[in-house]
Amino acid sequence: MTDLSDPTAAARAAATTINSAAGIDSHDIALVLGSGWGGAADLLGETISEVPAAEVPGFHAPAVEGHGATLRTVRIAASGKHALVLGSRTHYYEGKGVRAVAHGVRTAAAAGCSSLVLTNGCGGLNRNWAAGTPVLISDHINLTGTSPIEGANFVDLTDLYSPRMRAIAKDIDPSLDEGVYAQFRGPHYETPAEVRMAGIQIGRASCRERV
């Protein structure tokens, strides 16, 4: 496993591997595919490179069913820009630490990505949402007690979930709903009391990656 004692160096090494495999200098946007979202990458455009996650520094084969095992570069049909599709995600409950959880996002930034789209499979408390309903995250409650930020870096999270990007999504599909997402540590599921005190969406991924 790659040494993550220097997260920035590890991300640069992974980004170099990914960009070289795709034959490009940089990527434009990153997409992290959560449980059940694997097929979304096929709708974006032409895949020009696909690397097994285990062959990229700092990544490993997914430990959870429903996640892809590759890092894919897709040329978006409409714009010609390059998307880095991260099919492999590390969850905190796997015991690899917060640096491993944030490694994918740090790698995306090192690869040149200036925008990030996170997806996950989570529970919803709105009874109007049928299973599989896509819902935007408007804000989050981090109940894990952990952060990917180290040292005296006081990052402003006011607009963490971009109002601009959410507006674009709603322009495309006005029926999209949104709500506050609460993340627990896992791997166990939440108690009924924990569910009642949390947000309207509940899961075990995304918050630390977004930070």
What name fits each language-model region?
Residues D159-I200:
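Active-site rim beta-loop-alpha module in soluble metabolic enzymes
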Residues E50, G151, V155, L176-E178, ...:
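A generic, residue-level signal for flexible/boundary positions that often mark functional hotspots
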Residues I202-V211:
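Residue-level detector of conserved catalytic or cofactor/ligand-binding positions
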Residues A13, H103-R106, R164, I168, ...:
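Short Gly/charged-rich anion-binding patches and loops
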Residues I29, L118, E178-V180, R208:
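Residue-level detector of family-conserved "landmark" positions at structurally sensitive sites
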Residues T2-L157:
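Metabolite-binding pocket within alpha/beta catalytic cores that recognizes anionic/polar moieties
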Residues S5, G95, L160, R185-G186, ...:
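Residue-level marker of alpha-helix boundaries and capping positions
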